[in-house]
């Protein structure tokens, strides 16, 4: 799938390195801290004991020494000691008001270590601002863990990004992500900070999969890729959770399908319990061999997570690049600089470029092969008397059952409309239904509404990549200029009808001209990709008997042909209701 993300960076040195050669990250910060056997006094007192992030204030020497230990064995990128450095997790230690201070200090420590290593060897080093989970799970149903809004989460990550960038980070790393909806909020919050601050550095996102290949709420790697690739990020990957042996299948999928660079930072195997402590048993040699294999298959960035030590990374450098990094340290600076040209280049990839949407569990091709893509329309208050009555009764569970039955009958996506003339709480009903549907059906959802704020409310709750339906030019640009920013913000796709100020288009040329207007606004002004756009060319029922509409079906078919020929990449759809005299509920 081709993305239309044209970005100007204030610092893109890291991406330059990724394009040039396989980049090696560091290993485990937590494991390294444990080796120091620190006491409560090192953490600043008993109340802060165990808050690793606070060591950036109380023991910056320890954190800098850990960074240096990885830089000395060939790591080009070190992660800041800020994995739990957001206001929600720091608040557990009474440090929620010191987010900027802690993150800024952490980035400055890593920056100092990287600059010194670069001065010693002549090899560029990079600071990755580590951003871990918030501790909330917005996709879930737990009343405590899910009790946070999308915008509140975005604010949490905005603040942490600010501290890291101000401290000198070269890139930001959202890592160990278990809830894809939280990741979306983090990406939105970070990009809002970039816009407000007038800066842009690369954004790398890494999800965590269990041994079955899924995130905490069942999201597989295909869904994660479809959801995240539509957002303004620069690298996608995986880290933590399992050792490298369980990452093979997801990595193969990313290599075959991701247009973005790929990162893989596994644990040193699955943890085992030894005397009440988690121990990661994988030794440096087998770990480095398996991870180097990923690099040979097309992964761009490798490193380690829990349990990985400088020994693991030294071996990884040697197996990826074919020589030990220590040899560089004994060379002159000019010799070290020359090794830049012998580092292994990334294996060229030719990913499949197919537009996808996703539920919170899996991805769906927007253009099925063989076609057509079937959109179920029974979860629709405007098209189903039964659903209308269920909405009036607020019987959402029965509506979910209808949705499940439509998916079982072959629907690839579901159109969801809850608008009722009898009620004025469309937003609240959409939110209630989307929350239940997201957990019950694996078909992606289409949010069918004339109200942009209702569409945004749905997207803010939806863990996958959805579609917004109801876009048109009926009132000129009034609607489109409200809808497209929302589509862009959440990485959604958009379904637009060929309606303009003069009404519904009847001729092939008029249908195409309206589609062209919408296409040009969406692509050239809002930065959407053609693959994000679906056009419903509309037609009247073939059985109207009205003479002036006799040729409507032919004009619709030819309008589709014109759109396909002249707007490469866009998709089209048509409601089968209008080609059949059957009742709407059939």
Language-model segment annotations:
Residues 50-58, 71, 77-99, 169-185, ...:
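Glycine-rich, proline-tolerant flexible connector loops at the mouths of alpha/beta enzymes
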Residues 27, 70, 110, 172, ...:
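Conserved, mostly hydrophobic/aromatic
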Residues 95-118, 184-205, 254-266, 316-325, ...:
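Alpha-helix-loop-beta-strand connector modules within alpha/beta enzyme cores
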Residues 143-171, 178-203, 217-260, 288-293, ...:
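Alpha/beta enzyme core
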Residues 578-585:
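Conserved small/polar residues in nucleotide/adenosyl-binding loops
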Residues 17-58, 83-90, 121-152, 201, ...:
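N-terminal small/glycine-rich loop or linker at the start of catalytic domains
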